[in-house]
Structure formats: structure tokens, C-alpha cells
């Protein structure tokens, strides 16, 4: 299978710079599998699980939203707010974040930012799922 170059960037800098066979990612346009020589594309990235394959190895991640750009030169740039592999995820911290977000969503306090709480809950659930399943 042909490979393409994947460059993953976070606010902290380069996270990964690898040649991969396929990138599976949830965009604002739906779930996508990006292969080598994919047509040019720019899309938002949802808070969700993401994976890529190198030969027979599959690498899983929790992604906190962002942007993906596929150029015409067989390079994909993924700019994300945050990204964690299962090894990097602190399960206790993710479960605590989930509980806090759920509490804020149940709150009757008019000062609670519900949209922010929903985003925090989605991120926590994604992190927990990636940690528990991979």
C-alpha cells in the first residue's frame, strides 16, 4: 500500500511526523478514511477517536477537535487542539473531568456555560473510550 506523510500539530508544536498507509478521522463532513494520493481537502475535525495505520500496526488517539488539510503533494497536515494516545491518557483524570462536566450540565446555575460543559463531556468520554479500548 502506498504511504503518505502525516504531520500532526498541536498548540505545543509537532506531535507526530510520520509516513502512514491510512488516516481514519471524523471530520465535520463525516467519518473519512484518507489514503495516499487523496484529492486536496480542507475540513474541520470533530472531537472523536482517530487512528492511522503503518503497515500492519494501528495507532489510536483521542482528538480534541481541529482542522485537517490534504494537499496535492501526498501530505496531510492535522492541526488539533489536543491529542492523546491511550498511553498518555490518565483514566482517573478523564473520569473526574467527565463527572465535573456532567455536574455542570445538571446544574441549574444560569452562569454555567452549557456549550463548554458539553465539549468537556465529549472530550472526557472520548478519552475514556480510547484508554479503555486500545
Where are these regions (language model features)?
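Extreme N-terminal tail/first-helix region
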Residues: 1-13
Amino acid at each position: 500500500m502506498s504511504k503518505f506523510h502525516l504531520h500532526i500539530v498541536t498548540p505545543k508544536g509537532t506531535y507526530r511526523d510520520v509516513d502512514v498507509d491510512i488516516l481514519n478521522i471524523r471530520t465535520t463532513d463525516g467519518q473519512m478514511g484518507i489514503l495516499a494520493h487523496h484529492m486536496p481537502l480542507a475540513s474541520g475535525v470533530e472531537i472523536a477517536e482517530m487512528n492511522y495505520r503503518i503497515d500492519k500496526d494501528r495507532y489510536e488517539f483521542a482528538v480534541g477537535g481541529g482542522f485537517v488539510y490534504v494537499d496535492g503533494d501526498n501530505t496531510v497536515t492535522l492541526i488539533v487542539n489536543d491529542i492523546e494516545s491511550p498511553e498518555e491518557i490518565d483514566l482517573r483524570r478523564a473520569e473526574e473531568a467527565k463527572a465535573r462536566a456532567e455536574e455542570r450540565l445538571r446544574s441549574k446555575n444560569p452562569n454555567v456555560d452549557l456549550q463548554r460543559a458539553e465539549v468537556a463531556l465529549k472530550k472526557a468520554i472520548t478519552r475514556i473510550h480510547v484508554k479503555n479500548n486500545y
